[in-house]
Amino acid sequence: MIKGDIRKQQILDTAERLFTSRGFEATSVQDILDEMRLSKGSFYHHYATKEDLLRKICENRAERTAPKTDEQEASPQNGLQRMNGYLHEMIPFHGEGMVFLKMICPVFSNAVGKSVREGYADALKKAWAPYIEQALAEMIREGSGYTQYPEMTSSIAMDLVNDLWQQLGDEIIGSSHALDPQISASLLLEKIEPYRCALENLMCAPYGSLELLKLQDILNAIDTVHEWKS
């Protein structure tokens, strides 16, 4: 890695740490410069705005959610089980995705947030495409799914999943009142049902074979947002 690339990554790492610990809105470019003892010229040589930093951080996080090749090969799951697991892991309501959700909470619904969300969704789709396509191919071979257009079907499936988590995020973050978390989670699970049915129909998968999100995933997302709001 050349010197300029190293500096660029160091800025990203520092910004991510500060955004996570202090919050995106509470962290200024000057805070990042002070932390690194860096000049403004050096910063702006790599990034135009703080928003550009957030966008790149989130895209990197999306790329890291995809499974490692050795993990995939070691898994004893069949195609349908893989598909269920992959679609679940794409949704940023657990693991690496929770850090993304926490960082983007303050700007989730404004122009910056929507741009970051689009970048994250695009990066997710690019990172997960080969795995979703492979799982679908396994489903077809095993008889648990069918389509004449596997590549297009995989693309549409990922678009549905990306739309789902953004819709749920809008519901959770945009809520002006704090319901009991269990009640909120139950209501949100109902909103998942049309997406689940659409995905099963798209792949000709058995009814009820895809789960997408568990109740605990929704509760974790609600807790993260409530923590930010409080």
Positions of predicted regions on the chain:
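Hydrophobic/aromatic residues within well-ordered alpha-helical segments
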Residues: 50, 61, 65, 90, ...
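Short secondary-structure transition hinges
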Residues: 95-134, 141-155, 181-182
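Hydrophobic alpha-helical connector segments
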Residues: 56, 70-100, 150-157, 192
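C-terminal peripheral helix-coil segments that are non-catalytic and often amphipathic
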Residues: 126, 130-137, 141, 166-230
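Short coil/turn segments at alpha/beta junctions that flank glycine-rich nucleotide-binding fingerprints
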Residues: 21-25, 76, 142
